[in-house]
Amino acid sequence: MVKRFHGILRPLRCMRAGARLPIPAYIIVPLEPIRLLIATDMQAVDALIRRRLESDVVLIRQIAEHIISSGGKRLRPALVLLAAGAIEYRGPHHHELGAVVEFIHTATLLHDDVVDESAMRRGRRTANAEFGNAASVLVGDFLYSRAFQMMVGVNSMRVMQVLADATNTIAEGEVLQLLNAHNASIGEEVYLDVVRRKTAKLFEAAAQLGAVLGGAESEVEQGLATYGRHLGTAFQLIDDVLDYSGDATQTGKNLGDDLNEGKPTLPLIRVIQHGSQADAALVRRAIEEGGRDGFESVLAAIRNTDALAYARARAREEARRACAALGALDNSIYKQSLLELARFAVERAF
């Protein structure tokens, strides 16, 4: 039987629309209880990741190891494991799919860093800065193809469908983001559409896969998919906030990376739509030109408009919707862990 919730984690109630999560903004929810819950499973996932990275092409091993070993929260594999636990799945394939979603995520990071010309991720030089753009793109392709090799081993057309749809949607999101670069005219909904495709879709697939593996009822499967979509959206919105307010030693990224790349993220869109005429014009110009030359002035415009608080509020609403989507799940320590992840997504500092 699945372990039931007996107070190891604090329960998180799903609240009415617009309500704040019941935790002070300065408190970062620890993930240690969740790590302990899935520690054995996560060790199996990590071992599988390393085993399936093996290749007789040395450069593939070097680059894949560079990014896999550079840290990261492993949230997407954790979602597979927690969702599978929440429906009491007892088969062998949740480890395999945890590794698959991490490979897909890693491939997107390799490609992202090339497109964005990024030099730093997780406090280390990016693979493209270390090994070159061509090698990074090709190893990203290898990871995608290795992920699909592993999917076949699960022998489930439904799993294949979920992951094939997800990778296609992610690619669309990448292209849309590229098209939107240096475009100061896009609105909030256009930006959120990119977020849901590029970032939230893999969260959605990871949570849904746990239900698919266990043959859960449609209501439960769709609830977990919806949870993942809103969780991933909240996660990206907080990333937007941290790009203008985070501690680089914690985030592992330089402040202002989005502005440097001309990305019109939610805080900037808020200034353009609701800031003073001068602040809106300043931010428009900064997006169109890119670079960091006007970073301090853009920060001032963001503060003047209270744009970070607005983005955080939108993230909290996404987290609330994620919680509400789990209503069909029986209460368990796994469900409570999923609720804790929603809390972490909006209160984190890294």
Which residues does each predicted region cover?
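All-alpha prenyltransferase/terpene-synthase fold signal
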Residues: V2-F350
